[in-house]
């Protein structure tokens, strides 16, 4: 049976030293990021855009890489719920776990467009299209998912609730 990490192991790889062992096993199985390795990108598409936005200006609060990826995980779980019917109870569970680990950093409405513009520069984009790894369930994911700008904005608003 092929190694497919559960969602909680994926979550741990973002927040603990266990992540290196998991990442190494996934990278060994998919060294060219053709399929399985892409699961390591869950939360990173939005997370990297949020991180870049906060790094652009000294007047914004400090944001760690982990905090940015945590925001991305909540937003991308929301997108998973809306597009792939990822269970609502698991969406809430992800948000609650993330907010137990990190303090909430409010994403201001007037910053949404700037963050979305930064998404367009993600290295995983193909032909100008932002690609997401989204969840059907904790151990079932879809690669290269396309998402509308409106739904991305909705995910920011969900995170802010």
Per-segment meaning from a language model:
Residues 1:
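A glycine/threonine-rich phosphate-anchoring loop and its flanking beta-alpha core
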Residues 86-161:
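C-terminal charged capping/lid subdomain of soluble metabolic enzymes
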Residues 4-113:
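Active-site segments that bind and position negatively charged phosphate/pyrophosphate groups
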């Amino acid at each position: 049976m092929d190694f497919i990490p559960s969602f909680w192991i994926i979550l741990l790889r973002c927040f603990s030293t266990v992540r290196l062992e998991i990442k190494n096993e996934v990278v060994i199985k998919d060294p060219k990021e053709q399929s399985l390795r892409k699961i390591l990108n869950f939360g990173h598409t939005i997370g990297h855009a949020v991180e870049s936005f906060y790094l652009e200006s000294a007047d914004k609060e400090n944001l760690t890489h982990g905090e940015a990826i945590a925001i991305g995980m909540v937003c991308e779980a929301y997108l998973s719920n809306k597009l792939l019917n990822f269970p609502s109870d698991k969406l809430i569970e992800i948000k609650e776990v993330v907010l137990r680990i990190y303090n909430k950093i409010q994403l201001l409405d007037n910053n949404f467009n700037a963050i979305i513009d930064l998404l367009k520069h993600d290295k995983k984009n193909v032909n100008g299209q932002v690609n997401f790894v989204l969840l059907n369930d904790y151990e079932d994911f879809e690669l290269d998912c396309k998402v509308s700008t409106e739904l991305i904005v909705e995910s920011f608003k969900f995170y802010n609730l």
